[in-house]
Amino acid sequence: MTSTLSPPTLALRWTDYPLMDAALAGLCVFCDVRDPEQLTPEHLQEFQQWAQKAYFTPELSGWIAVVFTSNFINYSFSTEKRQEVLRDILSSYQRPDTLSERCTIFPELQAQQRVARDLMPMLMGRGPMNFYPDGQPGLPLSGQAITALQGLSLAAPLVSGRAMILDADDKQLLLDVVNEWQKPWLKRISLSVSKDDKKPIWAAARTRLMEAIRQVLSKQPRGKAHLPFAGGATIYHLSNSGQGPDAAIYTLEQPALRFMERASQEHPEAWKPLFQSKHHAADKTKDSDFGFRNELDEAMFSLPDAAPAFLRRYLLPPFTQALKVAQESGKQASKANRKKDTKKANDGPKPIPLSGLWGITELFLEEVVGMEKARIEAIEALGQRLGEWIVRENDKRLFRELYQARGASPLRHVLLKAMLEKSKQDAKSGAENRDLITTKDEYLRIFTEADELSRADFTLARDLLKMRVIQYLHDARFFEENKDDPELQNTELPTDQGEE
């Protein structure tokens, strides 16, 4: 093998190519620098010394089979041959780039060789010529690029049998997250001494990223209204295995991150129990620290596109549960074994404070849905006026009709009926405060478009109004005081089957 002195500079930089940038982030964290332009030949030599031992551990051998196919771990090779092939890859940056083509990733550099899937994930093998320019298989890469790509071993841990490769709009976030992953990943590699020593696996890639971001945020001073980094992040959860190469792509948008951070900071009393209620502990096959899954974390990757479904699945149920608890409490009170049933009821999960949850819902509408502030305030105000009227008149029938109204016409009927009843009462009592329950302008702002047709998100607005009314009634102890009332007992929980 011919080698030359290392180049005085490596000419490495961020590329906006996810595989390379993740690899560079791994090298930067390993070498304790914050920019790939600061990487030196001495840093790569330090990595080379680590890799020559670590790559032959069972843990990293399995990782290599997933990311770089069998490569130099091919067990048909002798031990000496495998070590020689590895040295050749790790020292690529020390040899001259002699091809006439430019490097695909660093076009300012000449290429050293055309590479296939054994040196760059998700390409084809060395033989096939299809889908390559001029029928020449492989992509031209410089020696620096070939060696740098091995930095993926420092940045892309194996999660559920696939490499978890992160791309971030803000490279400082990429570095910080890789920093959170690298230490436990390297510890796992160092403890891997025997093929028969099967360690519990890492799992739930999306939860792993959210957990790492929370760790990053917990270490940085920040204001409540902003994040210390820009943009979002994407996970490429991939396998380059010859048995079935595949990649799942999960995108985490900035609005979802802002919502998560603000909710946890501004309403911790509601966010913490909500978050914990969606936690699923790791089973015995998974690592206890890196194998658990959280539904809320996973659902963040569906935002903002699936915002209505998110609200209906995670934010609405605690509000409807408040009514259900009151109904169950009323039924238990009439049973002979009341104490036994009450004890069982108290053994359930801690209820989520609805006032805090409504605050979280408002943040969700602001950050994720992008709803205008005037409309949010109108929904909140209408819900409060309805709640005040129901409590004042103890009007359980009105609550029942409002709660079960699904379409625009039934909802308008309920609102008109409430307006009429309040107007009659105000006239009869001579009350000075004769504010209407709602007005035409308020109704149009909440439920209709400019042409006075129902909004496309009418169902969302309807659910938000019900959530606000329930929150007010719950805080006013309306459900608790009327738990035995037949009208409340007969209020059926509506089904949202078929609604999006």
Where are the predicted features?
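Intrinsically disordered, low-complexity regulatory regions
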Residues: K198-E487
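Basic, glycine-/proline-tolerant helical and adjacent loop/strand elements
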Residues: L60-A203
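Conserved small-residue
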Residues: M1-E80, L453, T459-L460, L464-V469, ...
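Low-complexity, charged, repeat-rich alpha-helical/coil interaction segments
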Residues: M20, L24, D35-Q48, Y55-F56, ...
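Alpha-helix initiation/capping motif
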Residues: T40, D170-K171, G407
